[in-house]
Amino acid sequence: MTRQLSFPASRVAVVSITRHGITLAGRVIAALPGARLFVPEKFRAEADAAAAGAVSCYAGKTGDQIPALFASFDGIVCIVSLGAVVRLIAPHLKNKEADPGIVVIDEAGRFVIPMLSGHLGGANALAGCLAEALGATPVLTTASDARQTLAVDLLGRELGWTFEASHDEIVRASAAMVNDEPVALVQEAGGGDWWTRHANGRSGPLPVNLKQFARLEEIDPEAFSAILWVSRRELPAGWAAKLAGKRVIYRPPQDAA
């Protein structure tokens, strides 16, 4: 597997509720060493054959297992119909910052669908890894991934960057990117080839609506719908007001260029 997960494989739960689905689940577990397979007790023998040593069986309803799975895992792979998964998880959803990444795979293993927390929760990255391992088609519906543009909430993640922004600022900057509005990218630190490694990999030139700068002081904030600032310094005096509501600040680790 060449793609990178957003969390350790040991933080992934795989859920399957049918005999044929459990066979596929064995392949998923093989692709994610350390992941755990959850199945109904009646399929214990099939599960042990498919993923020996990685099986947890439960009695009762699958829906009753969801709270514990949400609390214990960062990623949940469901080999269950998409509609059924919607009904199972709906009562337990909080917000995109807290919910785990959830991926759905059809029983034939043809399609891998990140259905919840694609970016912050890592579902898109998990889906990409599994699609590659299974020879399946990843079905990405997030606008930035469908259009292969910049995902504001993932910029620099592969390089260890963190970001500082409110929920509304992320929404505004993300909307500006996917709607082709002018966006400034000011990179004062971090280095690295972040574009080809971005969000499981991008190819070709940068988005045409993204204009690059080397220093924050070079930009006219009024000319841009959003400003993405990669730096280790604090905002210069007076700039907080100029960038209010439309800036995302990225902080590369100290040992980066």
Model-derived regions, located:
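Short, structured active-site "lid" loops
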Residues: 53-83
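An N-terminal, well-structured beta->alpha segment
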Residues: 2-6
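Extreme N-terminal starter segment of soluble prokaryotic enzymes
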Residues: 8-14
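Conserved mixed alpha/beta core segments that line enzyme active sites in large multi-domain catalysts
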Residues: 65-68, 169-173, 217
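Extracellular lectin-like interaction modules
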Residues: 46-50
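Conserved mixed alpha/beta catalytic, RNA-binding, or beta-rich assembly cores of soluble enzyme
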Residues: 15-34, 39-45, 56-60, 75, ...
